[in-house]
Amino acid sequence: MIPTKEQAWDLLCEYNEGEFHRLHARIVGDVMRYFAVQLGYADEADFWQTVGILHDLDFEQYPDQHCTKEAEILREKGVDERLIHAVVSHGYLLTVDVQPEHQMEKVLYATDELTGLI
């Protein structure tokens, strides 16, 4: 199952109460949508946005298990492995050894860091 951006937002809010984390998720989702269109993946813009929204799903409640706990949560919810790989890969070399492979995953890796500075 691939959640819609609305379902992704609701799921994010289940695990994140802080305004900063919610705002960060929204910004990363919007930036991911922008780059999907710019890089020729307009037909996947919703998916890219959903990945951006969910990328830090576990961070507020499980900072010491960031990315690994998220994979558990998403698998329990029946989320598609492609989405799980994408969100987990943004923690490459920090918390996990899942390497970003697809262009979308590489964009997420960079976008997460850059939007965190804003």
Annotate each PLM feature.
Residues 1-62:
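Acidic/His-rich, divalent-metal-binding segments that scaffold phosphate/diphosphate chemistry
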Residues 41-118:
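Divalent metal-dependent catalytic cores for phosphoryl transfer on phosphate-bearing substrates
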